[in-house]
Amino acid sequence: MRRWVLAIAILAAAVCFFLGAQAQEVRQGHQTERISGSAGDVLEDDPVGRLKVYVYDLPSKYNKKLLKKDPRCLNHMFAAEIFMHRFLLSSAVRTFNPEEADWFYTPVYTTCDLTPSGLPLPFKSPRMMRSAIELIATNWPYWNRSEGADHFFVTPHDFGACFHYQEEKAIGRGILPLLQRATLVQTFGQKNHVCLKDGSITIPPYAPPQKMQAHLIPPDTPRSIFVYFRGLFYDTSNDPEGGYYARGARASVWENFKNNPLFDISTDHPPTYYEDMQRSVFCLCPLGWAPWSPRLVEAVVFGCIPVIIADDIVLPFADAIPWEEIGVFVAEEDVPKLDSILTSIPTDVILRKQRLLANPSMKQAMLFPQPAQAGDAFHQILNGLARKLPHGENVFLKPGERALNWTAGPVGDLKPW
């Protein structure tokens, strides 16, 4: 057994040395690979001139006042809802004439209610969202003519507009009934799931671009780490028996590979975390309580091949980013075979994935920079909205027609906010 482990370790070291040298050539020579098919063109689309967005002017209690009370919201992985609002206020797609708008946006910061430790509390979010919708339905005519079908909302919670961080309870709640006709822009994405409805736009979580930029290392640094991961394997406070968190996938990673020399995995989060990702060939991106996490963004930005362990996940901007070509997908049940899966990937396949990841448009699409830049996540969201135009005949209701049930949902959600 020891000889086998030693042989694997030697093989891994040789692979890492070779890949590191090749990656160094890629970075020094700025070698990238054109994204195949139409995806590259889609990433580089300019949404300006293809749609107009009207931004509702809501009282500050729905947005800016919440942020003023707790500025930590700007650095949270759910901060896309704040930065999207800021972006649209000065965007060329914004119109001040609602009669010419293709889309209507309601700026509600539903995740900006944090615990002392910085975790979001979603319990007030449904009442807050409902209050905002009641306001726009009362003061403007545009909601009522479509009951939200030409409106979009940014809902970056763990399980989107189901507004709960535990999947079982999120499923029990379902999507807020008043949002059933709206387009949801959300980080959560999983096929055939109650909390992802048809037509939603799946986006990356927020990861601070400036912070990542500050941790860039020289481009000629070899990738000497084969597999890298930092994070929880067990969530003992919320899942003391250990069978529910990450559907056991993270626990399986730890139990199978904690002593494997190929795997640099730990619960410790070192100050060199970003640098270590840039020294790694593969970065594990397993599900946690939800399928997604900022690791996916970080892996792409730092050119570390994302190893996605989350069955049926719907990835950000999947119609534009060729995830199958840049990442590795491992079924949750196959985690015990992770070492053999990764070591069996041909070197030329790994190098091609690295060249694709080196494409600047790939990295840009995953970020919400300040100020906004061409091709970034803001523009990918607008591109997604533009591709839904023109609206179909079923968007606008006939006089007197109603599609939504304003009294549906949990009783607690009907209380005033």
Curated annotation (Swiss-Prot):
It is found in: Golgi apparatus membrane. The chain crosses the membrane at residues 4-24. Keywords: Cell wall biogenesis/degradation, Glycoprotein, Glycosyltransferase, Golgi apparatus, Membrane, Signal-anchor, Transferase, Transmembrane, Transmembrane helix. Coiled coil: none annotated. GO terms for cellular component: Golgi membrane. Residues 25-417 are lumenal. InterPro entries: Exostosin, Exostosin_GT47. It is a single-pass type II membrane protein. Glycans are attached at residues 144, 405. Its EC number is 2.4.-.-. The keyword DNA-binding does not apply. Pfam families: Exostosin_GT47. Its main location: Golgi. The keyword Zinc does not apply. Residues 1-3 are cytoplasmic. One of its GO terms (biological process) is protein glycosylation. Belongs to the glycosyltransferase 47 family. Involved in the synthesis of glucuronoxylan hemicellulose in secondary cell walls. This is Probable glucuronosyltransferase Os01g0926700.
